[in-house]
């Protein structure tokens, strides 16, 4: 019988937010009864993916389920992470060699297409909005030079509108893709929205959510609610936390892992 191990693959950040989120998810998996749960980061934070691979090989792991804790695929996934896992483009299941130790590698997909994400966005919007105002949901994506992130953001915005019944649903991107956050804020105001509930479809806080996004939605760093005046009207803005610590995402990870006989 093979000795199985789990690697939760994270982006990594110079802030501790991403690491805390990853560590929380890993500990929840252990509490659920999963053994040999490891974390590997693509950049900045340790242990790096390659360091975790070596550690798992030393521990005698000969089958790895690598689960990316990402909303969507993108350049990091297609140009960096896959090769750090000793795979080639298009490969998801392969026997790899780590310091002379043969390991069966299974590389799973991000979770952004799962219908659960729209439910999480729906709950965040309903918990945050003021029902006495015309409130609009602004789903904020990172943006990418590849199409994956935009596809996931638009998919979940569409589900929030069509399946959850919310009329005023908008989306925007911090960089690379369009529409920009500023453009979408203007459109929401022009459409008559009185309150903007900004929901970042991100894993964790970090440089973008702390430094880039707040001024684009007329807030200062660390402030979750405020107002601004445009077209002679006062608009309320509420800024939600990212989704990565939601306990239901642990269930999604578990579902992906159980496919491999855990």
Positions of PLM-derived features:
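Active-site-proximal alpha-helix that buttresses catalytic centers in soluble enzyme cores
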Residues: 1-262
